[in-house]
A protein has these predicted regions:
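Conserved catalytic submotifs in the C-terminal HATPase_c
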Residues: 100, 105-115
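Short conserved segment of the HATPase_c
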Residues: 167-179
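Flexible, glycine-/charge-rich segments associated with ATP-binding catalytic modules
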Residues: 217-219, 224-267
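Short alpha-helical segment of the dimerization/phosphotransfer core of two-component systems
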Residues: 51-59
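Conserved micro-motifs of the catalytic ATP-binding
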Residues: 72-78, 116-119
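Conserved glycine-rich
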Residues: 207-208
Length: 267
């Protein structure tokens, strides 16, 4: 059922995403123009402009989610062989820094080894960020979110867990339902509800899996990904500039829990 709901017409999804991005480009351009004259902004106007900026990032997250829904079958040219743990460590450290500034706590414990996987780097990182975002959505203020990595047989296992109130047993079966997004009180949340189903699809199309475990005292999203025996390319593209690219998945997926970057401070 979940798979059928995700398989909507790509042309329609592309048109919706493109239609959203055009006015968003204008919106961010106008925000940048106003921010460039910061000396003219009163504290009140600065606060209001920050609110508009956050709304822009929320809409960009929606557009990105719709685009990502099209890409749940990774393109062959996007698949590369790379060391998994260094790749995750770089993205998680960037997320930890941004979340820490905003008062949320993320910690991670990853192996220091160099096991490789064959995957779409951007989509894999996006999937992990969605799991972190979902953990923060369901967590109480000050709840710790932890990402752990391990090797089990021929699989890399990534576990994203929180110490919140957990998920009610009668809701566990519906957490992967697309377009169903509920907060910890069971009330509708302001998102499309595509994070978990897309994260699972990303893992499954890479030969892995995603399952949710909740005992009433916290929740864990357990990802598995097959290891690859190939060596990474000697000449690989540079690692994504997670912090420098202020429109990367790091900023859009986690926009509810970080302070959006003030546009005038961008290089």
């Amino acid at each position: 059922m979940e798979q059928d709901k995700l398989e909507y017409k790509p042309d329609y999804a592309s048109a919706v995403s493109t239609a959203m991005r055009r006015p968003l480009t204008d919106l961010f351009s106008h925000i940048r123009s106003l921010a460039a004259h910061e000396e003219l902004l009163t504290p009140y106007l600065r606060q209001e402009l920050e609110g508009v900026l956050l709304s822009g990032y929320r809409l960009l997250r929606v557009a990105d989610s719709i685009s990502a829904a099209e890409k749940y079958e990774p393109a062959e040219n996007a698949m590369t062989v790379f060391p998994l743990w260094p790749h995750l460590r770089e993205g998680l450290e960037a997320a930890r820094l941004l979340l820490g500034v905003s008062g949320s706590t993320l910690q991670y414990d990853l192996p220091e080894t160099q096991e490789t996987v064959r995957a779409d780097e951007e989509m894999l990182m996006r999937a992990v960020l969605h799991l972190i975002s979902n953990a923060l959505d369901a967590a109480e203020d000050g709840t710790l979110v932890t990402v752990r990595g391990s090797i089990v047989g021929e699989q890399a296992v990534i576990t994203v867990s929180d110490t919140g109130c957990g998920i009610a047993p009668d809701r566990l079966d519906s957490v992967f339902e697309p377009y169903t997004s509920l907060n910890r009180d069971g009330l509708p949340y302001q998102s499309l509800g595509l994070g978990l189903p897309l994260a699972r699809r990303v893992l499954e199309t890479h030969g892995g899996s995603l399952r949710i475990v909740s005992t009433g005292e916290g929740t864990a999203a357990v990802c598995s990904l097959p290891l690859c025996n190939e060596l990474p390319a000697l000449l690989r593209s540079p690692a994504p500039p997670y912090l420098q690219d202020t429109f990367s998945p790091l900023y859009t997926v986690l926009c509810e829990y970080i302070t959006p970057p003030w546009p005038y401070s961008q290089p």
